[in-house]
Amino acid sequence: MVDKTQGIIDPPIDELLSKVDSKYALVIFASKRARQINDYYADLHEGSLFDNVGPLVDSTIDDKPLSVAMHEINEDKLVATPIVEPAAS
């Protein structure tokens, strides 16, 4: 049995867009999480384990942080909540 190829086309963009308000929100959300994952691996290399949260889905060291972030969003491990800014007086 051949495993399903994973990458930027998996999970499908339509499934990801159902989790957020817009494409822009998806890009910002996924990129911020990918940066956290990247920082986690850098901290792991330096011996510091408690500064960042690692991947919340099964992944290997070869998986790109952005792909891991997309899988986390698709599996509802992360939820985007809009920031409500106070009204100007």
From Swiss-Prot:
Q: Which reaction does it catalyse?
A: RNA(n) + a ribonucleoside 5'-triphosphate = RNA(n+1) + diphosphate
**Which keywords describe this protein according to UniProt?**
DNA-directed RNA polymerase, Nucleotidyltransferase, Transcription, Transferase
InterPro entries noted in UniProt: DNA-dir_RNA_pol_omega (IPR003716), Pol_omega/Rpo6/RPB6 (IPR006110), RPB6/omega-like_sf (IPR036161)
At the top level of its lineage, which domain of life is listed? Bacteria
EC number per UniProt: 2.7.7.6
Q: GO cellular-component terms in the record?
A: DNA-directed RNA polymerase complex
Listed GO MF terms: DNA binding; DNA-directed RNA polymerase activity
Broadest EC class assigned to this enzyme: transferase
Question: What Pfam families has UniProt attached to this entry?
Answer: RNA_pol_Rpb6
Q: Please state the span of the N-terminal signal peptide per the UniProt entry.
A: none
Biological process terms from the Gene Ontology for this record are: DNA-templated transcription
The question of whether Transcription is a record keyword is answered with yes
Assigned protein family: Belongs to the RNA polymerase subunit omega family.
Q: How does it assemble?
A: The RNAP catalytic core consists of 2 alpha, 1 beta, 1 beta' and 1 omega subunit. When a sigma factor is associated with the core the holoenzyme is formed, which can initiate transcription.
**HAMAP family named among the record's database cross-references:** RNApol_bact_RpoZ
Sum up the protein's function in the record's words. Promotes RNA polymerase assembly. Latches the N- and C-terminal regions of the beta' subunit thereby facilitating its interaction with the beta and alpha subunits.
What name does the UniProt record give this protein?
DNA-directed RNA polymerase subunit omega
Q: Gene that codes for this?
A: rpoZ
